[in-house]
């Protein structure tokens, strides 16, 4: 996934602060106990102590919570260095009908699965699934309540503690001076994260997180894994299927990330996805936003947006005395964020754009502030500071090789500008920090998962962040892969795409019922 704040998204939640406080207490007091037998077949002897652990569950609000210990470096599991990962469970109400655990990842990378589960107790899942599975999630290594976690110190250039203020970067640095400043700022951001994370950055990649997922499977007592991943969670699930194909029971990947794409291809794919979504918004603004739509037609709406971008690039849009003025990057963040859930956001976006065009950007500034600390998402007050922005940077840079020199980024910038305008160029600029990042070992590749059972990929035709074409590609890369198409807008489908999607996914998860070749909702 691209790493700007606007690109991290999990499903909307209404979170209870008391439940989160209880979660924090449970993490601090939880422990693990050994079991006399390992549930994993073929486990290397040096990993047996991790696979043999049993989770010591404690009450935490309406959930049960525990901690899982995994090796920091799977190549050297006996060196004494570990990650301790928070785990949470919403137990099925009917233990007699229980199939096992359903583990899920809400996206990111960088989203706390524990906070996400605390927000609704697993209610996003269909009733048929909740009746047959314990719903389980966890904070991946380096994320959220993980000990240790990714942290970025303040860059030497004076940026913020989360690795820099990307709202001040030019969306498309075109002059030599702008490009030099952008590249220098990205290098400072990378150096700040290396300094603040104290040596853990080489160990927070998706392949290692997938190995943690297998340790969690064993600790839960499940012989095989039942899993659902949204957005980045599809990368985690794909990696698990490649490493442990015969330990998969059922795998749902919703909002697919295509592992065969390199960094520039992925940036271009996402840029095009947002461009299409914004064009769709311009075309249907009046239908969804009614009188709040500030333009009479698609071209007028596009012209209004382009005019605001140009104005904000020259001088931030005035938001009054009680808010920061809105520069071009902040405007872009607000617009793209609204593409994730049109049914919830397009009305507010339309009102904010109309008021900004009339000289008052206060509502835009308020939406930007909400995006920084959105009510009902994994960025929730009441627990230790989460590190989603830092983690999305760390995982994304480690997972995909990037060039060290600047020229390839400027070449990609030109191609993205032609294909997707500001939405493409911003995606490329987001990649700059990876130029100075510790190198990982992953390379773009098609899925290699011989022996995995049929995997269900869910794709949304109007998905801005994980375009539908990537779902088609990923489904085709799995042996026996199945594609369920949701003909709709917004990011991901299960939990927001209606009863048709829910029935198909639930039937697959519970009964492993396949979907037909042309399945669509």
Describe every region a protein language model picked out.
Residues 1-35, 213:
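Secretory targeting and sorting signals
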Residues 304-307, 334, 352, 367:
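Charge-rich, solvent-exposed alpha-helical interaction surfaces
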Residues 36-330, 394-521:
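Gly/Pro-rich cap/lid or specificity-loop segments adjacent to the active site
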Residues 280-281, 330-335, 348-352:
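A general alpha-helix detector
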Residues 372-375, 384-387, 399-401, 408:
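Long, K/E/R/D-enriched contiguous segments that form extended
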Residues 339-343, 462-465:
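Acidic catalytic loop of the alpha/beta-hydrolase fold
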Residues 317-334, 340-344, 380-390:
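Structural motif
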